[in-house]
């Protein structure tokens, strides 16, 4: 197994805002390589427990090795399974805290075989759960031009969505699009580079969201947070693009108006300059925290 690394973001802020009981039960809904979990366990007591969820089997195994702490229970499922898992583990009353870090792990981005980045020339895959049915190749080779335009516009906020979709449909007439580099080359003439940002970035984001139903998963889970948390328990959600942040902001706001939660931070929390300097991938992170009433 490769020795991948991933630097967790906003750790100090998470530690300060999520922990309400040092011997409580916490959920890391996006375990990844275990960076946030390892940091939190360093602050928690001996009786604390963290239940970590990740759809990526390799991530779960690497997290277990990286954390190496009996207080972690790592589960190879989506965080949507949290209500059932709490019940199965006979945890009464709910969790003291839930953390979601909705960013892509560095090891997933840097592993060309996963197909998340146009940099490595790997297969067009993009599945978090490699046992899942639909890949990014399935999307680009089977969706109509109208369907591609819709996901590029809605999930990637790509202003040239129609041109990008048309370029893909033209190219796949000759042969199936199979690799990330093939797709990036097809898009290059119609999606020029935006400063330091590759022109295909938003299309790749849109494909990843479509393949993994990311926005639907986030929305469904945030709505059931009151079932997962005990009174006084907190949910901390880190987002990396405006679509996710808008969903979290609006649902927290609605829950607050209905008296289910109170907002711990009324204004979004972003990384300090020093963190961004040391970890460039943290620059777009935004943290929102709510507490169950």
Swiss-Prot record:
It holds the Pfam family Methyltransf_5. Keywords: Cytoplasm, Methyltransferase, rRNA processing, S-adenosyl-L-methionine, Transferase. It catalyses: cytidine(1402) in 16S rRNA + S-adenosyl-L-methionine = N(4)-methylcytidine(1402) in 16S rRNA + S-adenosyl-L-homocysteine + H(+). S-adenosyl-L-methionine binds at residues 34-36, 54, 86, 101, 108. One of its GO terms (biological process) is rRNA base methylation. It is an enzyme of class 2 (transferase). It is found in: Cytoplasm. The keyword tRNA processing does not apply. Its EC number is 2.1.1.199. Gene3D superfamilies: Putative methyltransferase TM0872, insert domain, Vaccinia Virus protein VP39. InterPro entries: RsmH, SAM-dep_MeTrfase_MraW_recog, SAM-dependent_MTases_sf. Specifically methylates the N4 position of cytidine in position 1402 (C1402) of 16S rRNA. Belongs to the methyltransferase superfamily. RsmH family. This is Ribosomal RNA small subunit methyltransferase H. It comes from Elusimicrobium minutum (strain Pei191).
